[in-house]
Amino acid sequence: MVEPMNWISEVVRPRIKTLFKRETPENLWVKCPDTGQMVFHKEVEQNHWVIPGSEHHLKMSATARLKMMFDEGTWIDVPLPEVPADPLKFRDEKRYVDRLKEARAKTGMPDAFKIGFGRVGSLPMTIAAQEFGFMAGSLGMAGGEAFVRGAETALEKRTPYVLFAASGGARMQEGILSLMQMPRTTVAVRRLRAARLPYIVVLTNPTTGGVTASYAMLGDVHLAEPGALICFAGPRVIEQTIREKLPDGFQRAEYLREHGMVDQVVHRHQLKETISRLCGLLMDVRRTPEPGTAPEPTTPEPLPNAA
């Protein structure tokens, strides 16, 4: 009698459970990191990935950011240059080319930047958004080329350039080729400044490493989303190095605002209105040359190549 009972309990019953099991989507609910509150995924998505009640700002895809910003959620994608996929033939636990394939399949993007041209509050604007889901939004040759192409688009169309930064820093798989994007993007920002075009940076969670050390902190105005981690080295690394406990909220948007590194902390729902107003004011000011000065050239020298 033992064998039939084992067969029933080990084979028949699991099959019955599987047969009548009710399918529940894995992404039906979203859990708030602050309060543990469970919210419908669709409700959070409709709220621009802000948890209702706690107002916790979750990570947001690059495409969702452009849709949130541009009037009627429509824009023209700026074509981005192609770069060598794996010039160093890098391999750690996986080959770099395999990591790229996985990231592209996961995000549907060729790399960690998406750039669009459209209107925000009826004002023409060029917007670049980093995709943290693509290898932590790390900066490589493709990212550097994308940022520069966005700046060139803003120069060509005479629009403000807005960046939504979200990155873990330089992409280690590209070595020095990644690091050289830091000065290249800095030159692109200088070209915008020479042409008297606004460059607005929105620091989102997280913005760290080489991105913080370059174009993310070179804006005319720095906005930040609530609670965003903004730093070069993260708090855990610093605590392990100095063997001391850091202050509460250290390197968060509000802390940086209090210490003058961020101009304003803005709720995600107010970003479009705030950026539209800022860019409108800056464009009005910069259209008029200062008394006694000649207009700045709008086509400065071309940037150096990525490689």
Swiss-Prot record:
GO cellular component, one term: acetate CoA-transferase complex
MF annotations from Gene Ontology: acetyl-CoA carboxylase activity; ATP binding; carboxyl- or carbamoyltransferase activity
Pfam families per the UniProt record, alphabetical: Carboxyl_trans
SUPFAM superfamilies: ClpP/crotonase
Enzyme Commission numbers on file: 2.1.3.15
Record keywords: ATP-binding, Cytoplasm, Fatty acid biosynthesis, Fatty acid metabolism, Lipid biosynthesis, Lipid metabolism, Nucleotide-binding, Transferase
Top EC category: transferase
InterPro entries: AcCoA_carboxyl_beta, Acetyl_CoA_COase_Trfase_b_su, ClpP/crotonase-like_dom_sf, COA_CT_N
Disordered: annotated segments: 286-307
Every CoA carboxyltransferase N-terminal domain range: 28-297
Cellular compartments annotated: Cytoplasm
Keyword Nucleotide-binding part of the UniProt annotation: yes
Pathway linked to the protein: Lipid metabolism; malonyl-CoA biosynthesis; malonyl-CoA from acetyl-CoA: step 1/1
Family, as annotated: Belongs to the AccD/PCCB family.
Subunit structure: Acetyl-CoA carboxylase is a heterohexamer composed of biotin carboxyl carrier protein (AccB), biotin carboxylase (AccC) and two subunits each of ACCase subunit alpha (AccA) and ACCase subunit beta (AccD).
HAMAP family on file: AcetylCoA_CT_beta
Protein name: Acetyl-coenzyme A carboxylase carboxyl transferase subunit beta
Organism: Methylorubrum extorquens (strain ATCC 14718 / DSM 1338 / JCM 2805 / NCIMB 9133 / AM1) (Methylobacterium extorquens)
Gene: accD
